[in-house]
């Protein structure tokens, strides 16, 4: 049957398809189009024209909007709008605390109201709840442990981790390493500490923590060794870098370790995980969470040199706080030079201060702060509460809360930026101001000089036993300390957490009266008291908060694990504390 080929009615070939069109020649002309088909084709053509016109208008509208969008983005992201049309003042964006201090100074020092008693600062109590069953039997079944014989099931291999950062970032890595070793049924090699250019501390594990205590405390839960055995190392020519190294994703889940890490460990008998900061999710099974608790609150005890001096510092603070019943306030003040530079905040030093901070940022962090996508807004940093509180601001806040000039304050800090200038107002408001440098002799501190983590361990211990702890800038130190205090003081962090966005607004109001400021500070203290006893809801293994900041309820199970792990014994192993202190004897565990 012959197929029909239709000629193009308006073609230039007079209705003939050429051979170049890959068509076939037809002798008969095409039949004329019916009227209905002509109407349909005309309607289709008009519809296409209308659609094309609409599309053109829409695209043209977008084309006109593009320059406007680009200009808006340029103003918001590349250069502040205030830089083009004149500086726009944002309330709280300028550091005016020295001005208001001078204005209110007479009122502060003439305030005759009753001083806040340190023994009655904290009003809220943790509500007692029905204790949940501890995962004791679960631990036994998962680890194959026998607490009588301290026997463990055959291991899957050796786990090497390298912890970086400062004291408490390393502490987090150690606790996570114990948990991962338990999860993989591995033998954990004493964690290695990486040297960091910022922290500049070459300390090893044994310089900070008691290795023997660490190993013995975890006996029967996770096996700990100091080194990988020779029979393993000979396979890698005694070169640690030749050992299979795994880069684990941040906040890795239990399934990730079982699926990705365990097979490699089983195959080679040893693995190395580096870096190891935040490499385990917070949501883990109860028996893994319990290992974190045991490591943090039982196994990690500061080394003898640190614990010995720390005990002396606590004793001296208690002695100097006789006017307040041996109780004192500790303040974690992050106003060191590098912290001020990193925050990208400006105070009252003008261009000279800005230039100085630019040099420090470039020296310590290279080009991190000069990237094109990095917009530095000191004013917005301050409004959003991201600027470190100055010693003056801390002093005014505490005086407003009701702490008088008889209050003993321990300052946990490195070298303060421009100390002569910035520490003077705080010293004026609180004459009983002490640091580890003022409490210890130069000879006692000599072995610690040049080791930031060892110095931080001293601050950690003295702050841990204070009646009131004040955090000013966040970070691992206060988060770990608040969790440790919750564990130590029956669930209450006993910590002042300033509402910094609110505080900066108050401290730039030149019309504010001292009575108004005091009222706001007492409300802030009350809010810290309320939040201090809050326990996040934990459903099964769905934990979104840090076990190190909120250790309850899981870590309460530590007291049920061993009959010889008594309250007193526990205190002695929590960072080298001692039972003679009034604070320790009054702590409820």
From Swiss-Prot:
Q: What is the lineage of its organism?
A: Eukaryota, Viridiplantae, Streptophyta, Embryophyta, Tracheophyta
Keyword Cell wall biogenesis/degradation among UniProt keywords? no
Q: Which UniProt keywords apply?
A: Carbohydrate metabolism, Fucose metabolism, Glycoprotein, Glycosyltransferase, Membrane, Signal-anchor, Transferase, Transmembrane, Transmembrane helix
Q: What is its EC number?
A: 2.4.1.-
Annotated membrane-spanning segments are 68-88
- Where does this protein come from, organism-wise? Arabidopsis thaliana
Composition-biased stretches, type Low complexity, lie in 10-23
> From what superkingdom does this record's organism come?
Eukaryota
This one is known as O-fucosyltransferase 11
UniProt: substrate binding residues: 332-334
